Amino acid sequence: MASSDKPLHILDIALQGGGAHGAFTWGVLDGLLQEPRLAVGAVSGASAGAMNAAVLVSGLVSGGREGARERLRSFWKELNKSGREAGPLIPMIEAFPETTRAMSSWWTTMFGDLGMAHGSPEMGREMQDILRKVIEEHVDFAAIASDKAPPLFISATNAQSGTARIFRKDDLTTEALLASACLPLYFPPVTIDGKDYWDGGYSANPPLVPLVLESANDDLLLITVNPQARDQTPRNAAGIVDRITEIGFNQSMRKEMQGLFLLQSSIGRTRAKEGLIAQVERMRFHEIHDEETLAAMPAQSKMLPVRQLLLTLRDAGEAAARRWCEASIESLGKESTVDLASRFGPG
């Protein structure tokens, strides 16, 4: 990587959610933070992406690049530690690695489909409280709200209206982050200002339009976790539920990206170029993903922050970031490095 200490390119970063698979995003961020030619601009996130985003910004404000790297490492380490202390399942999997390879069939046998792991979402309140403690230990909301912090956009889904609420620097709280990561079959809704919220992945995964409209930067990097495509159609109930969930969590991003692609494609025929149209015209889009690695992970592992899983995904994310930097960094400020038509276009 470059030896210069002067950042040459400012990247806005949008972080998709994916439970424990968000450790891949941790690795990507760690790799990007080691690249001196890059600087972090505005950040958005949903669910696990929201956690990564808030921890990243907290670390950047308090300790710069190395502070952000250390805070992300500590956050994911504490998630694993808290998961091990909460019950016997994660210690069992870590003690018997072969269990992980059979995790999908074992989980289905014991609990049924992914969404039926709990008889009632209220049973997840204890885990919600554990996550609250981890957030409070790693996210500095005063730092996030300060003038030193980059813009931050976090999504949660209004459980009644189905619309996205976007939390910004000045109104972000622990409860907002919990809401962004509230899978309704596992956890009770998070109530904020008298309204109930579910996972932000249902409505803005991750938030993109705020980055386009409210940031002055022209390069937007998506870090995606959920595979867009699968080689085969699932035939059993558990596989079908998993794929439906995957499609659902990708849908909001696909629709936003399709809209931006169609708008950008038609700009040449538009005379009045103001507001969103003017902003979209100048945008350059990029993406880091590793569909092969993430598609091989059982869907149930998203709910299990097993140490080896987290480290494997972290390493895969860092490697993906390095590959992207080597291939694409010279294109920043010049052109998009993701083909929006083939990646997100209709069809």
Kindly give the residue locations of the regions a language model identified.
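Small-residue-rich anion-binding loops in enzyme active sites
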Residues: M1-L11, A149, A159
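Patatin-like phospholipase
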Residues: K6-A14, G19-D129, K133-I135, D171-A179, ...
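Short, glycine/charged-enriched secondary-structure capping and boundary segments
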Residues: G27-D30, S58, R168-D170, L211-L213, ...
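Short internal beta-strands
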Residues: V43-S44, L222-T224
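Charge-dense, low-complexity polyampholytic segments
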Residues: G67-S74, P91, E330-P346
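Active-site-adjacent alpha/beta core region of enzyme catalytic domains
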Residues: L89-I223, R230-Q232, L276-P298, K302-T312, ...
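Acidic, Ser/Thr-rich peripheral helices and adjacent loops at domain boundaries
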Residues: P234-S266
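A short, acidic, amphipathic alpha-helical segment used as a generic capping/interface helix at domain edges
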Residues: S265-G275
